[in-house]
From Swiss-Prot:
Keywords: GTPase activation, Ribosome biogenesis. GO terms for molecular function: GTPase activator activity. This is Der GTPase-activating protein YihI. Belongs to the YihI family. It comes from the Bacteria. The keyword Metal-binding does not apply. Residues 39-77 are annotated as: Disordered.
Amino acid sequence: MARKKKTRRITDIMPIRKADKKIDITKARSGKKLTRYELDAKAREDKKKRKHKGLASGSRHSAVEEKANKLQNEIKDPKIGSKKKIPLVVEFVNKPEKGQVIPVIKQVKKQDPMKELENLENNEILNELLDALDAGKTISKSDQQFVDECLDRISELMEELGIEDEDESEDDLYRTFERMDINQFR
């Protein structure tokens, strides 16, 4: 049977001494004087801290690793640099520079002149404004401008389509009245 080397570790079998217990100094009684055991534990912790003042063993080898770690940390810093990929070859393929964009001219679909004329003649707003003018009422400048634009467009469309405005004179109306047979309406 092989021999076992004796250790001084504290195990479950051995009773725990008060001196071996780690006493949390912050948990120690607040406002009261520390006990002898607590003072001893505190002194031991202070001594351990004082004992390791110098550099760690093998510091000349670990210093190189720290520098490498610092370089990696600098590269990983998200605040520095951009993640956007930059092309190494400049390509200009029919792409205008910013600020030199040619505006696209929107082509307005022209409506059939006959339909446009019909829409203008059936425009309720225009008819109401014309009725107000015939009644002798005054209308605002914007309404008057709208009426003028619509009437000008109507006259342009009538010329384009070859339709003549039949302005009947009073003489023509009088002649038609004379020719009419009144007995027809009884």
